[in-house]
């Protein structure tokens, strides 16, 4: 089943489908468009033709094997084994898998990856070109080797120990440490309580290779494996290849029984407080575990129950949102929902993030809302909105079924194999949902609360900072008991069915039309000077996008109003619009798939919007209201502000925020306009200032350019644009942004900053900044340089040295306010290895300057860029971005002469020359965060 979480549907007029009678007791069939079978050795396969993206395919190896299958001396080796699958197989020694695929533009990390969980390990090769002779066969051979032919050489095992140790270090944050304190209580008496996937560093560093090989032999076997191949392929041909390649793999003799893992039931309520020095929020959760039927065949009754669960969750979410919009919110965030938790178990989760030292108030409030639902259930009006909103989403999904990606299908088949999650295909699910949803009643959904919210198998979990005031077990249980016996009023559902705009709009005529042949688009200038650029694009069948901008942005605001300007976008969106607060507006938009939000950057202001073709008019109505009738709701402002103040109150303890804030100040040379969010920043955010800034920036529509791209008729766009955008006020104001002089420090900046890390690590940041002409040649050269650096650092710092889990490289060129380029390089590592590893960062750069990149690295990078470019052409967003860039920057990036031809003509000598011109003479900021002594 496609998991359209938290959305449900209502029967309305739909495209005509052949009507089927669904019996709830019948088993849900597998999508008939997927070819499936089981080989004699027990391996399962799923093969499907799909063309999103065209000329590409994805290959998945699904292992029903995870961390729960480890012995104590193997703690962490399921994950270790996942790494080893990329470090030598029978047919691809060493880094042969990566090198082979990267030569065809298939990138490690993004297209070549894997994950390990408690119960499964899944490998993927994604977006592999199918037009290259033999590449499909190569990928099948890789899956074949992953099944049974890993080399697991001692040399490669030893080389990978450092990488995984550094992954452990990188992932060891407050959230991870807190979870390791409360999981043993929640899962008491089960194997879930003693495994965390990443494992024990002692085992990682010192296990005997034979121990890893034993785990591999015991569990990587054909009866616990499935492969999924989805893409632009001939299914019959690929199925025959699968039989030929995979059938000879021998089944393991005397195979161990694959255990399932149970969590002991308990009548008493468990309780745990988990604290950490770096934790920034206090959270109270109540988990009620319930065994489910994962791994068993599913009937349509199960599918119906999943819909009921989704309906339930969407309605509870709406109630919590409404609670947080008014007065003084009792908590920062909260939820009361039912969902899947771990394999074999669902959990009813009641969670609230508390205001500082106010856990009692948060717990009582979220338990009160939960008890209100349990006692009184939901109103029919709530249910009808939830159904209608689901229909809108599902109908859009159905119309765009040709845009369901290869990877989405492959992941769906993985879930089907591992847990038997229904996967009937969008056609069957669409038809079934339309038949069953009208039969679901509010009483039926409400009854679920009484089934799910109970006392047994319940655990209270409190997490937060070490020095905060936390509830005791007695206090928490007392609050729950109090709520269960207190008087609670039923929820009253307010209607929201008024029209967005009641007045008649005069609009404006089109005074000039210009064809944009290079984009197959048209530009209209309206009588109020609004510019509208439209391109019909039907790559996404049920989508229309809108982007608008005007020069100015927050650069027009003086320094003392920067905090208000910085928060304007977030707060104005929370106020609602016109006469409607945010909750009323959300109810009014029931059944419409439409979003509009104002945007503010340092140099521009504008709007982002999206809708279906049928909701396009509503999108323009919202734009009109945001211009002409913006809403400024002080109660909503104060409610949101109190949540922000509570949220950041303990952020000063978060090493990640400390580092990010420090870098922000250092890279701006401590410019007075540059500030980071802290209590003083929020103190300077003023409601009246936000109103003033917004009204100053979002006015004079004649200074705005609107881009509309999507699957909608041009005449419809013309009519509605002239009516709504043509009715916007033109103040005949000409303005531009202001260069406020925010620049990086000149020369070389070296800083070593001590940080209190709970888990010792160093964080290295190297940033180069230099003036460079903004043109398409330099934009592409920078992309190629970044790709080459990614490859070099993966090989030298990660693989050869085992020094880090990964080096992240970021790059970009800016045109305004000055033409300038930047390259950022960052990684975590063992503090004792900082200088050695950092020297490799500079060595690789110097090597490119002195010798140029290698042919291999250059060709891999260019191939990847060309592959991604080809895929992007088949999406509406490509044309939206191209049009915007053309107007804003003056470059037609859609023209092959400005991309494909430039890349194909580029040489590694060009990159060597570009690297020299950029790095030599660049400002350098070298910042290392190290643990305090």
Task: Annotate each language-model stretch with its function.
Residues 18-47, 234-298, 302, 306-307, ...:
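Proteolytic maturation boundary segments
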Residues 2-10:
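Sec-dependent signal peptide recognition
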Residues 156-211, 215-224, 229-230, 235-243, ...:
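Hydrophobic, small-residue-rich alpha-helical packing segments that form membrane-like cores
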Residues 48, 53-70, 77-78, 95-145, ...:
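M16 family metallopeptidases and their MPP-like homologs
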Residues 149, 154, 161, 175, ...:
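Non-catalytic, conformational "gating/processing" segments within enzyme and secreted inhibitor domains
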């Amino acid at each position: 089943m496609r998991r359209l979480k938290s959305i449900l549907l209502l029967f309305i007029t739909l495209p005509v489908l052949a009507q089927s009678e669904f019996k709830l007791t019948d088993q849900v069939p597998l999508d008939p468009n997927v070819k499936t079978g089981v080989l004699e050795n027990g391996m399962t396969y799923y093969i499907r033709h799909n063309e999103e993206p065209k000329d590409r395919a994805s290959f998945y190896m699904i292992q029903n094997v995870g961390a729960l299958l480890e012995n104590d001396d193997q703690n962490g080796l399921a994950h270790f084994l996942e790494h080893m699958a990329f470090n030598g197989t029978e047919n691809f020694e060493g880094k042969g898998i990566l090198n082979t695929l990267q030569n065809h533009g298939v990138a490690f990390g993004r297209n070549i990856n894997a994950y390990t969980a408690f119960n499964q390990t899944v490998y993927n090769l994604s977006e592999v070109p199918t037009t290259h002779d033999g590449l499909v066969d190569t990928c099948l051979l890789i899956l074949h080797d992953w099944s049974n032919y890993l080399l697991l050489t001692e040399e490669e095992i030893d080389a990978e120990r450092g990488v995984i140790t550094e992954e452990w270090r990188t992932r060891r944050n407050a959230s991870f440490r807190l979870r390791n304190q409360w999981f043993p209580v929640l899962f008491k008496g089960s194997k879930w309580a003693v495994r965390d996937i990443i494992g024990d560093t002692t085992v990682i560093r010192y296990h005997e290779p034979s121990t890893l090989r034993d785990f591999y032999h015991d569990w990587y076997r054909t009866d616990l494996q499935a492969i999924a191949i989805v893409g632009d392929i001939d299914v019959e041909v690929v199925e025959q290849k699968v039989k030929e390649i995979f059938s000879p793999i021998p089944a393991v003799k005397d195979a161990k029984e694959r255990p399932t893992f149970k969590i002991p039931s308990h009548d008493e309520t468990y309780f745990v407080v988990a604290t950490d020095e770096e934790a920034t929020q206090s959270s109270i959760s109540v988990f009620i575990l319930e065994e489910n039927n994962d791994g068993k065949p599913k009937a349509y009754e199960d599918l119906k129950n999943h819909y009921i669960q989704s309906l339930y969750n969407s309605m509870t979410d709406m109630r919590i949102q409404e609670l947080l919009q008014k007065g003084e919110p009792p908590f920062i965030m909260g939820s009361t929902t039912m969902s899947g938790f771990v394999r074999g178990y669902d959990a009813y989760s009641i969670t609230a993030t508390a205001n500082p030292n106010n856990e009692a108030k948060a717990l009582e409030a979220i338990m009160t809302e939960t008890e209100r639902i349990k006692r009184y259930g939901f109103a029919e009006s709530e249910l009808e909105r939830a159904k209608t909103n689901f229909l809108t989403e599902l109908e859009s999904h159905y119309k765009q079924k040709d845009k369901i990606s290869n990877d989405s299908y492959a992941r769906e088949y993985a879930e089907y194999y591992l847990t038997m999650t229904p996967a009937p295909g969008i056609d069957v699910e669409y038809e079934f949902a339309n038949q069953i949803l009208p039969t679901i009643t509010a009483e039926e959904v409400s009854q679920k609360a009484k089934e799910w919210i109970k006392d047994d198998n319940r655990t209270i979990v409190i997490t937060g900072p070490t020095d905060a005031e936390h509830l005791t077990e007695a206090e928490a249980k007392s609050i729950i008991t109090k709520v269960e016996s207190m008087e609670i009023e039923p929820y009253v559902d307010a209607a929201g069915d008024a029209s967005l705009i009641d007045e008649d709009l005069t609009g404006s005529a089109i005074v000039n039309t210009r064809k944009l042949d290079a984009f197959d688009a048209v530009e209209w200038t309206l009588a109020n000077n609004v510019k509208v650029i439209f391109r019909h694009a039907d790559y996404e069948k049920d989508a229309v996008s809108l982007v608008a901008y005007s020069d100015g942005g927050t650069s027009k605001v003086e320094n003392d109003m920067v905090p208000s300007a910085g928060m304007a976008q977030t707060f104005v969106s929370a106020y609602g619009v016109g006469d409607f607060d945010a909750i009323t507006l959300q109810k009014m938009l029931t059944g419409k798939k439409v979003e509009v939000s104002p945007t503010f950057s340092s140099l521009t202001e504008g709007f982002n919007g999206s809708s279906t073709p049928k909701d396009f008019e509503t999108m323009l109505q919202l734009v009109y209201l945001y211009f002409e009738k913006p809403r400024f709701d002080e109660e909503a402002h104060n409610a949101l502000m109190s949540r922000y103040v509570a949220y950041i109150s303990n952020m000063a303890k978060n090493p990640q925020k400390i580092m990010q804030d420090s870098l922000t100040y250092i890279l701006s040379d401590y410019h007075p306009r540059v500030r980071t969010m802290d209590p003083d920043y929020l103190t300077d955010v003023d409601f009246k200032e936000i109103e003033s800034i917004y009204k100053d920036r979002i006015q004079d529509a004649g200074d705005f350019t609107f881009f509309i791209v999507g699957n909608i008729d041009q005449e419809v766009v013309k009519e509605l644009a002239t009516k709504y955008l043509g009715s916007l006020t033109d103040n005949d104001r000409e303005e531009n942004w202001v260069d406020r002089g925010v620049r990086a420090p000149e020369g070389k900046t070296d800083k070593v900053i001590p940080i209190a890390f709970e888990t010792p690590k160093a964080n290295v940041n190297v940033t180069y900044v230099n003036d460079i002409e903004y043109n398409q040649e330099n934009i592409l050269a920078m992309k190629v340089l970044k790709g080459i650096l990614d490859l070099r650092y993966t090989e030298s710092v990660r693989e050869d040295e085992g020094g880090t889990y990964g080096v992240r490289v970021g790059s970009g060129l800016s045109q305004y306010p000055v033409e300038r380029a930047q390259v950022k390089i960052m990684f975590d590592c063992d503090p004792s290895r900082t200088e050695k590893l950092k020297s490799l960062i500079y060595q690789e750069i110097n090597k490119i300057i002195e010798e140029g990149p290698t042919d291999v690295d250059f060709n891999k990078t260019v191939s990847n860029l060309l592959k991604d470019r080809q895929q992007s052409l088949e999406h509406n967003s490509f044309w939206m971005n191209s049009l915007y860039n053309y107007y804003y920057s003056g470059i037609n990036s859609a023209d092959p002469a400005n991309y494909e031809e430039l890349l194909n003509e580029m040489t590694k000598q060009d990159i060597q020359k570009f690297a020299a011109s950029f790095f030599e003479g660049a400002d350098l900021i070298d910042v290392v965060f190290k643990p305090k002594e």
